């Protein structure tokens, strides 16, 4: 009997916890790990945009170690692809 009540209380607690921690319980329950991953990807993309890039014809340094070329590759100078 005690085990039954303990199981009922545990299920009610976990259900309440799920609804309290969900962002929007009316439509769907979101996976917090996927949400965190998407936010991290957005952060990385915004940091790449802030870094800036070089136009074709500008010196970029050694390939793969130099500066980032806009819409091209780096072979000592930025080359359009």
Curated annotation (Swiss-Prot):
Keywords for this protein: Disulfide bond, Knottin, Neurotoxin, Secreted, Signal, Toxin
GO cellular component: extracellular region
UniProt-recorded Gene Ontology molecular function terms: ion channel inhibitor activity; toxin activity
Classification via InterPro entries: Conotoxin (IPR004214)
Primary location class: secreted
Tissue: Expressed by the venom duct.
Signal peptide location: 1-22
Prosegment location in residue numbers: 23-51
The record's note on its domains: The presence of a 'disulfide through disulfide knot' structurally defines this protein as a knottin.
Family the entry assigns: Belongs to the conotoxin O1 superfamily.
Protein name: Conotoxin ViKr92
């Amino acid at each position: 009997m005690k085990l039954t009540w303990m199981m009922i209380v545990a299920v009610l607690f976990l259900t309440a916890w799920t609804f309290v921690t969900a962002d929007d319980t009316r439509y769907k329950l979101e996976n917090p790990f996927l949400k965190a991953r998407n936010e991290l990807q957005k952060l990385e993309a915004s940091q790449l945009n802030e870094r800036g890039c070089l136009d074709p014809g500008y010196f970029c340094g050694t390939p793969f170690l130099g500066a980032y070329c806009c819409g091209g590759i780096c072979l000592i100078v930025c080359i359009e692809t």
